[in-house]
Amino acid sequence: ICSGLVGSEMCIRDRLITATAGHLLNSDGKKIRPLLTLIISRMLKYRGSADVTLAVCIEFIHNATLLHDDVIDTGKIRRGKKSANEIWGNKVSVLVGDYLLSKAFKLMVKNKSLKLLEILSQTSLVLARGQIQDVGNTQNIKLSEKKYLSIINAKTAELFRVSCFLPTIITR
């Protein structure tokens, strides 16, 4: 279901954006976050289409963070293939990551829910803050376990949490 909407949302005339985003979106990622959104929506007996849109938003946000993370960490491999920044360079990777974030927010507006927009906007801020804290502590050999877990929570757990929480909003 999601892959159809992902494909239609990425159907644009710019080959560089399509190639770069598609390189990651069409890779062998597990897509656990959007799957959680869909499964929990079904468990809550949701019958609309907002769950699919939200799942795609989550996948776009997640992939944007991966594109940015590979640039920051100078990653060369992602999901067993050359990373996007290794193929197209850092500038393109950052900009396509920004493009995916923008697409996610554009899709959120389609749901016409300020609550959903607020939650996903806050989530994006938490993800960015976690990445910034990670970068700021790269050389910190005295990083406490508490601080490390806080960073990981912001970078990783937050999007999982929201993937599970959003269905409770659309079923109200």
Task: Show the residue positions of the predicted features.
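Mg2+-dependent prenyl diphosphate-binding active-site environment of isoprenoid biosynthetic enzymes
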Residues: 15-172
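Single conserved hydrophobic/aromatic residue that forms the stacking wall/gate
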Residues: 1-7, 12
